[in-house]
């Protein structure tokens, strides 16, 4: 039987070699060279985080809050480098989430993983 950690490292290597990761890395490197773009993304992510925190605390997230974030996204996405970065980041995050789901589902660990196990 193979060591699960060795397999995890193989998966990490495969992910690093994927087109999705390479696309993300190239987009990130482009953004990191421009302080204005970095700041725009940082501001957007901060607002996105604040909205998610509100939601998690059970506070009301108004349609105005959502609209404001959507407007900000539309504005910053007019820059092709930012749009490419956010798109590549979203695709990579989806792959990682899919991998986590595949693992959790295959070992029937989903409920335990998220704290919903029957006691």
UniProtKB/Swiss-Prot annotation:
InterPro entries: Com_YlbF (IPR010368), YheA/YmcA-like_dom_sf (IPR023378). Disulfide bonds: none annotated. It comes from the Bacteria. Transmembrane segments: none annotated. Pfam families: Com_YlbF (PF06133). Belongs to the UPF0342 family. HAMAP family: UPF0342 (MF_01526). This is UPF0342 protein Athe_0692.
